[in-house]
Amino acid sequence: VSEISDVLRKQWESLCFNEAKFLNDVGLSEPAGEKGRTALEMLWSRPTCDVNGISGGYQGEGFKTVIASKASAKVSFRLVGKQDPQKVLSSFKEYVQESLPLDCSVNFLGEKGSKATEMSLSHPAFEKARDALSQEWPKPAKFIGSGGSIPIAGYFKEILDMDSLLIGF
């Protein structure tokens, strides 16, 4: 996974982002993720492995001491840069299988994914869009990251050889 450019890093550092307040607002005392990374780096430019849901065993109110025979988890990955979804998936499967206790098994379902897409911020159209947005708002527009695996943007890049500028407000 490549590092962000110095230009982008300086843009992010110029934001009035209070990391301590942000972390407090989301219930954390320190960033959860890669050591030595800022919260914005982890939110905007780094890959993730997210456990979106876990189920298994007794789920009603009260206590039960019966050990579940089955459990499930919904897991997703945010890919960035040139990460290959099939390689990430196979690495994850290999890790899980190697970590299984004796006499346990695992099944994987829904094994689809999209390639990450990284846009060239040096493209003149991107700078023109940033300038236009900056004219409409009281502060200069900044480029941020927002994951990297938005499928349609990847298809535009792969099939049409066009970058996509995704604008959020």
Please describe what each predicted stretch is.
Residues 77-80, 106-122:
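A short beta-alpha structural unit
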Residues 88-97:
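Short amphipathic alpha-helices in soluble, non-transmembrane regions
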Residues 1-83:
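Midchain, well-structured core segments that form catalytic/ion-binding scaffolds
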Residues 75, 129, 156:
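Hydrophobic, well-ordered secondary-structure elements that form the walls
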Residues 129-130, 147:
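Phosphate-moiety recognition in structured ligand-binding domains
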Residues 45, 52-54, 63, 67-71, ...:
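Zn-dependent metallopeptidase/amidohydrolase metal-coordination segment
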Residues 1-3, 101-108:
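Flexible, glycine/charged-enriched surface loops at secondary-structure junctions
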Residues 7-17, 116-125, 154-159:
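Short glycine/threonine-rich loop-to-helix capping motif typified by GTGT followed
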